[in-house]
Amino acid sequence: MSKIITVWGNPGCGKSMFCCNLAKVLTAGKQKALIINADSSTPMLPVWMPERILETGASIGNVLTGLEINNALVAERVVILKEYPFIGVMGYAAGENPFSYPELKYEKIRSFISEASKLVDYIILDCSSNMLNFFTPTAIEAADLTVRIITPDLRGLNYLRAHKPLLTDEKFHYDGHLTFAGLARPFHAIDEMDHLIGGFDGLLPYAKEIERCGTSGQMFKALAYCNQRYINSLKLVRERLEEADAKEVVSPDADIHAPETEPEEIWDTPTDREEMPDADALAESGRKERKHHGHGFFK
């Protein structure tokens, strides 16, 4: 079974970009990761791959509303990136909206996540900010590790305060979530927000280059422009997953390192590409991509 990482937070905090960067870090050793976004209000397939025309048959909606969900059905809807062949994605197709499919059901979502977890090493669940979308609370419940991304401002603070009462049940493991400050900028009162929110585990500093990647259909190239604070947050997620593995299977060769604490300001310049850990280790030549249905990708 794969490790399930759920990412949630307030609107515009950088969740989807974080998921893309995390997938590249986790697949640096040729492990396989699957990013799943079930937010029908913003179909992600054309955002991840704007140059490709994917029919609605590739949509995650066909899986979540299927009569019977099994790993074969899930595998058929996974789109594998040619430039990063160890990363697969699932989401809604261009033109789809919340009324394109019947309302999502808890049992179907749990079954879907369970079947998807049999296919790859890591499942990354990129959640909607709307808790009325059943996928988000269900994904938090199913997670081995949950990442909470909050913008360090009044929007993020009040979003967190509004949604915390909805996640008080022990099954959501609210106190065990990692909390990152998303799109942190120089003018943000990080220390004050850290105190009000209850403590940040890491920072995801804003950078124009990262934003440009997100708005130009190059989300999987943004890792090269993340500074050390952002990289340390990604490392922390990987290390927490390794710690969980170590608890399950005691291994004397476990290579777990504490994240580095850098003295530089959070708005420093991006780390050079050569210094980036795993930034483009998986890149392949060529710009054109095509769809694969599990050939050499799944377990």
Predicted regions and their residues:
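Walker A/P-loop phosphate-binding motif and the immediately C-terminal alpha-helix
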Residues: 2-45, 116
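Conserved beta-strand segments of the P-loop GTPase G domain that flank and frequently precede/overlap
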Residues: 7, 36, 91-92, 124-126, ...
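Phosphate-binding loop that captures ATP/GTP phosphates
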Residues: 29-34, 38-87
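Cytosolic-facing regulatory segments adjacent to core modules
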Residues: 71-84, 88-132
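Well-ordered beta-strand positions
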Residues: 122, 145, 199-202
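Inter-motif core of Ras-like GTPase G domains
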Residues: 134-153
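Beta-strand-loop-alpha "switch" segments that mediate conformational coupling across diverse proteins
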Residues: 182-224
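NTP-binding/hydrolysis catalytic cores, primarily Walker-type P-loop NTPases
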Residues: 216-299
